[in-house]
Curated annotation (Swiss-Prot):
SUPFAM superfamilies: PHP domain-like. This is Probable phosphatase PC1_1798. It comes from Pectobacterium carotovorum subsp. carotovorum (strain PC1). Zn(2+) 2 binds at H15, H40, H194. GO terms for molecular function: phosphatase activity; zinc ion binding. Binds 3 Zn(2+) ions per subunit. One of its GO terms (biological process) is bacterial-type flagellum-dependent swarming motility. Belongs to the PHP family. Keywords: Hydrolase, Metal-binding, Zinc. GO terms for cellular component: cytosol. The keyword Transmembrane helix does not apply. Zn(2+) 3 binds at E73, H101, H131.
Amino acid sequence: MYPVDLHMHTVASTHAYSTLHDYIAEAQQKNIRLFAITDHGPDMADAPHYWHFMNMRVWPRLVDGVGILRGIEANIKNIEGDIDCTGPMLDQVDVIIAGFHEPVFPPQDKDTHTAAMIATMARGDAHIISHPGNPKYPVDIRAIAEAAAKYNVALELNNSSFMHSRKGSEPNCRAIAEAVRDAGGLLSLGSDSHIAFSLGDFTHCERILQEVNFPQDQILNVSPRRVLDFLEQRGMPAIAELANL
């Protein structure tokens, strides 16, 4: 069990079913010390309104020993790497995940997907690329792993991709883990939980990590401190309330 989960959704994304309180309670039961709420960016049809992200400043940083990161799963919008987290929103979030979603960026071809993903990393706002192994969006895996290492962006192993969503992801996810390992980059583990019971469930991710002998020192989720150090290295301000997690 890793003590950090960096991808989940609340009822603010209306196809999810749990509240912030639900996730805090689940984190306490599972000894999860830090999680990021990453509801969908506003260009998705059922995503929270822009004001949801602007008002995240009212969230507590720490509740009964559980740290909370203010995040977003932004949408990659085009081949230029634009995402739907811009302007004042950037000042309200701690962590930005970005990925392809069909209502915003319909699947195209491998070269287009690869170019868009690398452009997103190069623009510098995204910290993590979500579910890059989605078979509907084939990419040049070696190229994105090398770009992620170059731009200090983590690629995600998404546990939900092995279960409920994005059927056929496993071979791609295994290849991505191998490519990130060899490029010296970083992996982020995300439950992509849409209900609190699956918070921190990385069962399938851990199997892939073991199969490819992936180094623990290239995994963000090993500790809260590693995540916070990574975000600070990426230019995000230190979060004093989480300093002792």
